[in-house]
UniProtKB/Swiss-Prot annotation:
This is Nucleoprotein. Residues 39-164 form the CoV N NTD domain. Packages the positive strand viral genome RNA into a helical ribonucleocapsid (RNP) and plays a fundamental role during virion assembly through its interactions with the viral genome and membrane protein M. Plays an important role in enhancing the efficiency of subgenomic viral RNA transcription as well as viral replication. ADP-ribosylated. The ADP-ribosylation is retained in the virion during infection. The gene is N. It comes from the Viruses. Residues 13-25, 168-200 have a biased composition (Low complexity). GO terms for cellular component: host cell endoplasmic reticulum-Golgi intermediate compartment; host cell Golgi apparatus; ribonucleoprotein complex; viral nucleocapsid. Keywords: ADP-ribosylation, Host Golgi apparatus, Phosphoprotein, Ribonucleoprotein, RNA-binding, Transcription, Transcription regulation, Viral nucleoprotein, Virion. InterPro entries: N_prot_C_CoV, N_prot_N_CoV, NCAP_bCoV, Nucleocap_CoV, Nucleocapsid_C, Nucleocapsid_N. Homooligomer. Both monomeric and oligomeric forms interact with RNA. Interacts with protein M. Interacts with NSP3; this interaction serves to tether the genome to the newly translated replicase-transcriptase complex at a very early stage of infection. The keyword Thylakoid does not apply. It comes from Bat coronavirus HKU4 (BtCoV).
Length: 423
């Protein structure tokens, strides 16, 4: 990736360092010493959280647009910044803010990629690596914050506001402050360029308010052009009825559960049956692979190669279909080792304990009592039904042969699916 152009230097004849007998303007006093720049400042404006729901992005989304980055570099984390203010009635909590940092930079520079930590949300693009980023962090005395922009089709979490957008006074004051910072950085020239760590996400230029206002549009256009040239579309696919039907027609073990095609629709109800899964709480059943915890869950799943190479398989003939062809079931078992040295070890145990057999704690729907034609509630007690003539029971309808769910009662219990590998 090309290095961004250096900032343009603006100098004046009366403040050139090479001129002799240089005199200062104004009050004639020496400037106040400035502290060292904060090396944990994000390149982008933050997200303000106005609700209780935590920050979460679907897989492959959540990385701000960067005109100078490649797909492999688009990975990092959002870090929550809790705020509070002292009032006359005590301490008042303010709305939290979230800031984005590239992998290996910022306050959590030493945190391994996708490690679990409170207040940290990892995001990455498809094809991104876990290598430390070359973009570093921002020097606020030199560079103004970039208004955070996302790829088209990105689902912004509900009750989150992108700072620097909209017409409120907060964003207006921030924009004017950015303009002043940019003007100061331009007048300082090359002396301030060494304060920013790493490579900038954007090409530098004269820090005017017009250039800052046009920057988000420029980033969006450059990203769309790159997507068109590579033949990729970043917009998430909208699940239609036709798509849902096609997903349902896939083989059961090849389906993928999402929010639009949840776990129950894809794989059936959770339960103890031989063809039922016993993993998943209410949130996982609802969101599937779009659950914010999915990256940690997926680390427990074996790859296709590991599954075929580590499992004990058994082929069982169950029955025949309508044409007389035999129906077989492939059962498998195995185990994996959870390494205590892994940084996600405690998170794995927490996920397993909260999701294994979680269906046993699901609330049961109460059946409403049936009412008669005159509006009276029918009672099921034997004393009230003595005078009612017993109706002959109907013969149960014949079931269609070949249905997996209808034959589950006759199947032998399958062993739990676990896998054995040395981490």
């Amino acid at each position: 990736m090309a290095t961004p152009a250096a900032p343009r230097t603006i100098s004046f004849a009366d403040n050139n360092d090479n001129q002799p007998n240089q005199q200062q303007r104004g009050r004639g006093r020496n400037p106040k010493p400035r502290p060292a720049p904060n090396n944990t400042v994000s390149w982008y404006t933050g997200l303000t959280q106005h609700g209780k729901n935590p920050l979460a992005f679907p897989p492959g989304q959540g990385v701000p647009l960067n005109a100078n980055s490649t797909t492999a570099q688009n990975a990092g984390y959002w870090r929550r910044q809790d705020r509070k203010i002292n009032t006359g009635n005590g301490v008042k909590q303010l709305a939290p803010r979230w800031f984005f940092y590239y992998t290996g930079t910022g306050p959590e520079a030493n945190l391994p990629f996708r490690s679990v930590k409170d207040g940290i949300v990892w995001v990455y693009e498809e094809g991104a690596t876990d290598a430390p980023s070359v973009f570093g962090t921002r020097n606020p005395a030199n560079d103004a914050a970039i208004v955070c922009q996302f790829a088209p089709g990105t689902l912004i979490p509900k009750n989150f506001h992108i700072e620097g957008t909209g017409g409120n006074s907060q964003s207006s004051s921030r924009a004017s402050s950015n303009s002043r910072n940019s003007s100061r950085s331009s007048s300082r020239g090359g002396r301030s360029t060494s304060n920013s760590r790493g490579t900038s996400p954007v090409s530098h230029g004269v820090g005017s308010a017009e250039s800052l206002a046009a920057l988000p549009l420029l980033l969006d256009l450059q990203k769309r052009l790159a997507d068109l040239e590579s033949g990729k579309s970043k917009q998430p696919k909208v699940v239609t009825k036709k798509d849902a039907a096609a997903a349902k027609n896939k083989m059961r073990h090849k389906r993928v559960a999402t929010k639009g095609f949840n776990v129950t629709q894809a794989f059936g109800l959770r339960g103890p049956g031989p063809l039922q899964g016993n993993f998943g709480d209410m949130n996982y059943n609802k969101f599937g692979t779009e659950d914010p915890r999915w990256p940690q869950m997926a680390e427990l799943a074996p790859s296709a190669s590991a599954f075929m190479s580590m499992s004990q398989f058994k082929l069982t003939h169950q029955s025949n279909d309508d044409k007389g062809d035999p129906i077989y079931f492939l059962s498998y078992s195995g185990a994996i080792k959870l390494d205590p040295k892994n940084p996600n070890y405690k998170k794995w145990l927490e996920l397993l304990e909260s999701n294994i057999d979680a269906y046993k704690t699901f609330p049961k729907k109460e059946r409403k009592p049936k009412t008669t034609e005159d509006g009276a509630v029918a009672s099921s007690s034997a004393s009230q039904m003595e005078d009612v003539d017993a109706k002959p029971q109907r013969k149960p309808k014949s079931r269609v042969a070949g249905s997996i769910t209808m034959r589950s009662g006759s199947l032998p219990a399958l062993q739990d699916v676990t896998f054995d590998s040395e981490a």
